[in-house]
Amino acid sequence: MAIDFSQYQTPGVYTEAVGAPQLGIRSSVPTAVAIFGTAVGYQTYRESIRINPDTGETITTQILALVGEPTGGSFKLSLAGEPTGNIPFNATQGQVQSALRALPNVEDDEVTVLGDPGGPWTVTFTKAVAALTKDVTGLTGGDNPDLNIASEQTGVPAMNRALAKKGIKTDTIRVVNPNSGQVYVLGTDYVVTRVNAGEDGEANTRDDLYTIQRVVDGGHIDPGDIVQLSYRYTDPNYHEVIRFTDPDDIQDFYGPAFDEAGNVQSEITLCAQLAITNGASTILACAVDPEGDTVTMGDYQNALNKFRDEDEIAIIVAGTGAQPIQALVQQHVSAQSNNKYERRAILGMDGSVTPVPSATRIANAQSIKDQRVALISPSSFVYYAPELNREVVLGGQFMAAAVAGKSVSAIAAMPLTRKVIRGFSGPAEVQRDGEKSRESSEGLMVIEKTPRNLVHVRHGVTTDPTSLHTREWNIIGQQDVMVYRIRDYLDADGLIGMPIYDTTIVQVKASAEAALVWLVDNNIIRGYRNLKARQIERQPDVIEVRYEWRPAYPLNYIVVRYSIAPETGDITSTIEGTTSF
């Protein structure tokens, strides 16, 4: 698609491969592997909070009732270790009240008593106090006389500080006493309260903030106590594009790759681990965000769309091996590459349960037929999972992640052919040599196990085997690096926005040549020729740079030709057991 400068274009440096899409300036060469797929969906967090003093007036009510029908004597009450004097078994409410008000830890206006002589007595404290204790050794008569005490508190518990994380799954909150290990009970000891609805003002979304409040009546958490909480939460940015350089950070964020049964629960974690194992230094990840329990292709597409205009991406990898994702990724790669964000994709088919037949794999490659997209074959591979301490069968999408890591770890001119892929024991499907050759010729990047037990790429091809230039993975890679570098050089020289003088064309040509020389010196391309720069007469604000470039072609074949030399002279023996002629 030719650049149409008769239509308005944003001022900048534009590049155009003859017969290919228009490409615009962005930034330096991208090297990140972008992965989208499923994740655990939450993170786990632990924190401690101190329970604030209750707010408002707290009322403590205690009911005292004599049992066993005592006929004489007295009893004592104690509050926080401070005992009263003797209280007659048939005391009036005034006698009980006077005894309690005489305690050093109670003010006169903090306690009142109601009841008949001999009880029961209702004791009301206007503050939070512990239950009264008793001494009934002074009671006489009756049948084992005793004093029953029932206590309850009513009041308003304070609002504690908000918990540290947003998007808490409230049903996963666990509250314990850090000293005794006692697990507090929801509803009995505490309640969960929403502090606010977050920036969106909508309740029950991922930016909500929560806290806990103690239950005053009957609960086991007191003001001033320090309690420890653990919970699961989904950060509001959990399903956005996030940059990683450390595999441990990826696992901490998206969860372990496998569940206890050995099923893949975090496609992102496993893909990222394999990409980094094979040389990737930067991962851009985006977790799918399903609305229900089942992940749909629309969920994958939503995650893929979030990679738009991300300038670090070199290769896209899908965490799913479902066939419908292939067309979605191809459309994404094509649209972004036509809009100054050049990128490629390596995909795989999921044959972990039922292998995808070779004919189907070939048909999938033919339906894609894009020099920017590679499709891995076969569809299943054996992988040793150290966390499970056993081998599992994975789909081809995980091999695609490993190959993507290998690709970005080398210079653009380096072919993928015969490159060793680490992390796998080998294909889980048996293929004959003829079948593998046919697949390679039809646009499948075949992974095989060599007689030396190495797992490598048989031939680094794209899904477009039309010609050498569209077939070889490293040629389109060289082109991407080349246009990025030329745009960088031209833009860095500050030419855009300057007036065009007689020397401007020379400056533009010199800047482009400096970029091309750098590419040659760094073994990105082999060479270039016929570099020209001209001002277009019909569009005088456009300077066009043209040249031809030569890629570093992959060495795919070595031909050794030989023939039998006829005997032309006498045969003589030179060393015992050998002859010469």
Swiss-Prot record:
Superkingdom of source: Viruses
Keyword Transferase part of the UniProt annotation: no
Main location: virion
Any one Gene Ontology BP term: symbiont genome ejection through host cell envelope, contractile tail mechanism
Claim: Ribosomal protein is one of the keywords in the record: no
Localization (cell): Virion; Host cytoplasm
Keywords: Host cytoplasm, Viral contractile tail ejection system, Viral genome ejection through host cell envelope, Viral penetration into host cytoplasm, Viral tail protein, Viral tail sheath protein, Virion, Virus entry into host cell
Cellular component GO terms, alphabetical: host cell cytoplasm; virus tail, sheath
Subunit and interaction comment: Homomultimer.
Family: Belongs to the myoviridae tail sheath protein family.
Role played: Polymerizes as an extended structure around the baseplate-tail tube complex. During ejection, the sheath shifts to a contracted form, thereby making the inner tail tube protrude through the host cell envelope.
Name recorded for this polypeptide: Tail sheath protein
Upper classification of the organism: Viruses, Duplodnaviria, Heunggongvirae, Uroviricota, Caudoviricetes
Gene this protein is translated from: 124
